Amino acid sequence: MKKSLIEKLQCPASKSKLLLLYSHDEIEDDIVSGLLASNSSNKYYYPVVNGIPRILSNSLQTFQSAVEEYIENLDANDQELIRNSFILDKKLKKDVL
């Protein structure tokens, strides 16, 4: 994903702009993996996997293993919000089954 694309992206949930929270791999102006976050009071997170921004409501859980690789590099508040999202997702799946 080109860095210049970030300014054109919008969170589907909050309608706010997306910001690059963390970038793990970059090749020149391309982001290979990282994490985008909404610029709103209720934060929503979207991973960038293999250069593709995954901007879907369940993408954080779908790509959980990719996000877990670099979660320790985020600030404590973001780490907690993301981990709580993973826990909630597991709880919901358990309740459905």
Feature annotation, model-predicted:
Residues 2-97:
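Conserved N-terminal segment of class I S-adenosyl-L-methionine
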